[in-house]
């Protein structure tokens, strides 16, 4: 929690204003931030200086694992996070690749689970990683990525948290996640949860101990209409002790995650938090 608040304070004090063409808003921006989540010690990075809807963040992660490309599927899992980008993004609404209401196109897990190959066909990146790790293999390229510039025109949004690189060392599984852009008050709040949970799940289904998740953020920003709430409200609050995340031990395979796992299989214990803050969301 401290490292997140330190980043927020750094942006407020040292950030530079940048015009964002997609949203038409200014962003107070810094370049490069590195966050670490110790899954081995159970240090769940859940924001306590405002109420965080952790269930929706995990629901979104499950959708990425399953390769969903429709906002309705994400809603069924328990999150409305893709409703706006699927149905209110002006550029996407006029895109000939859009299939209709709730269609997100080729984004995130829909790319990673069906990564296009040169010359035709596709690769299921996550399946390859899980199969390798279950056999104790780390080929130094166990990367689940959603980043495919050749397919950007076929989706409603370029991926922000775009790559997850798993590494196995002496029986312990580590994760290096890379994020090109982070809406720090809103998106990063969820992304931290997702990096932690993804490593915990992958370690559990491949039979390894979980180590640390290392989270690299390139462009970290606060939108101009979020700044006052961050500076004058959230950063004035004293954080509570970090809670813990409990995952159903019966989750033992990728097939489990693809089929029967729901939010009921996750529980957060000891979560104390300050009142919620309604930060504006930019489409």
Curated annotation (Swiss-Prot):
Pathway: Pyrimidine metabolism; dTTP biosynthesis. PROSITE patterns: THYMIDYLATE_SYNTHASE. Its EC number is 2.1.1.45. It comes from the Bacteria. Keywords: Cytoplasm, Methyltransferase, Nucleotide biosynthesis, Transferase. Homodimer. InterPro entries: Thymidate_synth/dCMP_Mease, Thymidate_synth/dCMP_Mease_dom, Thymidate_synth/dCMP_Mease_sf, Thymidylate_synthase, Thymidylate_synthase_AS. It is found in: Cytoplasm. This is Thymidylate synthase. Catalyzes the reductive methylation of 2'-deoxyuridine-5'-monophosphate (dUMP) to 2'-deoxythymidine-5'-monophosphate (dTMP) while utilizing 5,10-methylenetetrahydrofolate (mTHF) as the methyl donor and reductant in the reaction, yielding dihydrofolate (DHF) as a by-product. This enzymatic reaction provides an intracellular de novo source of dTMP, an essential precursor for DNA biosynthesis. Its main location: cytoplasm. It comes from Glaesserella parasuis serovar 5 (strain SH0165). One of its GO terms (cellular component) is cytosol. One of its GO terms (molecular function) is thymidylate synthase activity. The keyword Repressor does not apply. The gene is thyA. It is an enzyme of class 2 (transferase). The lineage of its organism: Bacteria, Pseudomonadati, Pseudomonadota, Gammaproteobacteria, Pasteurellales.
